[in-house]
Regions:
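Extracytoplasmic/secreted proteins, especially bacterial periplasmic and envelope-associated proteins
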Residues: 10, 14-17, 40, 44-47, ...
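Catalytic nucleophile-loop/oxyanion-hole region of alpha/beta-hydrolase
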Residues: 4-9, 25-63, 216-217
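Primarily recognizes the serine-hydrolase "nucleophile elbow" in alpha/beta-hydrolase
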Residues: 47-123
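Alpha-helical scaffolding within the catalytic cores
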Residues: 6-12, 91-95, 153-161, 194
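C-terminal catalytic histidine-bearing segment of alpha/beta-hydrolase fold enzymes
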Residues: 35, 169-184, 190-232
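Short substrate-entry loop that stabilizes the transition state in hydrolases
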Residues: 1-35, 76, 88-89, 179
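Mobile cap/lid helix-loop segments that gate and shape the active-site cleft of serine hydrolases
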Residues: 84-87, 117-161, 167, 188
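Loop/turn elements at helix/coil->beta-strand transitions in domains of secreted/extracellular proteins
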Residues: 18-23, 63-65, 101-105, 165-170, ...
Length: 232
C-alpha cells in the first residue's frame, strides 16, 4: 500500500469536514535489515505516531485523540498499535520517543488479526499468509517453526496483544466468515475478524465486525467509526 491510497481505507474529506485532521504515512515493508522482518513496518508506524504527537502544538492536533485506519497489512499494523502496550520511553533524549504510542481507536479493512500460523490454519485451512513477517517461507516452514518463534508471535501478533485496557476497534470485510472452511481469499477472510472480535469481547474490549448481510452494527464503515470515537 501507499499513503496516496488512503481514501480506500477512510474518507479524508468527510473526516476533515468533521474537524478531524488526517495524516497519512508510508513505512518500510518487511525487510531483512530488521529481526524479525516485521519489526520494520510496525516500528516505523510507532515512530510516525510519536512524531505526530511531538508536533501536536505546531499542527494544532489534540494528541489525546488519535486513531488509526488501514487496509490489509496496514490494517494489521493499525491493530497492533491499538493493542500493544505503550512503547514510549519517558527517559529518552529524543523527545519524539517520549511520546505515547497508544491509540484511542482503530478502524480497519481486510485485516490479518493474527500472525500465529497455528491459529490461521485452525480458522482457515488454506491459509498462506504471514511467514514473510518472520523470514519463513513457504507457509509450511512458517508452521513447522512456530514453536521457535513464539516469542516473536507474542510480540508482533495483534491478537496476542489484546488486553482489557485496549481501545475500541472496527473491522470491515467483504464476505461473511466460515470458520474451519477453505476461503477464496484466505489472506483477507473475515474469519480473522470474527475470531478477533470473540477475543476482544472476552477481554472487555469493544469490537465491531461489519460485513455485507451480517449482524447489525452501530457503524457500517471506518470513517463513521473514527468520527464517533475521535469526536468524544
Amino acid at each position: 500500500g501507499s499513503k496516496e491510497r488512503l481514501n480506500r481505507f477512510a474518507d479524508p474529506n468527510i473526516l476533515l469536514k468533521a474537524g478531524i485532521s488526517v495524516v497519512a504515512i508510508n513505512y518500510r515493508y518487511v525487510t531483512d535489515d530488521e529481526t524479525p522482518p516485521v519489526k520494520a513496518p510496525l516500528h516505523d508506524a510507532v515512530r510516525a505516531l510519536q512524531f505526530i504527537r511531538s508536533k501536536a502544538k505546531e499542527w494544532n492536533i489534540d494528541k489525546t485523540r488519535i486513531g488509526a485506519a488501514g487496509g490489509s497489512a496496514g490494517a494489521c499494523s493499525s491493530l497492533w498499535l491499538a493493542f500493544h502496550d505503550d512503547l514510549a520511553n519517558p527517559k529518552s533524549k529524543d523527545p519524539v520517543l517520549r511520546e505515547t504510542s497508544r491509540l484511542q481507536c482503530a478502524a480497519v479493512i481486510g485485516a490479518q488479526t493474527t500472525l500465529d500460523p497455528k491459529q490461521m490454519v485452525e480458522w482457515t485451512p488454506n491459509s498462506k499468509y504471514g511467514g514473510h513477517a518472520f523470514g519463513l517461507h513457504p507457509f509450511d516452514k512458517f508452521l513447522e517453526n512456530r514453536q521457535k518463534i513464539l516469542p516473536w508471535i507474542k510480540e508482533y501478533s495483534p491478537y496476542a496483544n489484546v488486553t482489557k485496557d485496549d481501545p475500541p476497534v472496527f473491522l470491515e470485510y467483504k464476505t461473511p466468515p466460515a470458520i474451519g472452511e477453505v476461503q477464496r481469499d484466505p489472506t483477507h477472510t473475515s474469519n480473522f475478524g470474527l475470531k478477533l472480535q470473540e477475543h476482544c469481547h472476552a477481554n472487555g474490549v469493544p469490537c465491531e465486525l461489519y460485513y455485507p448481510n451480517g449482524p447489525k452494527t452501530k457503524h457500517q464503515d471506518t470513517t463513521s467509526f473514527l468520527i464517533t470515537h475521535l469526536q468524544k
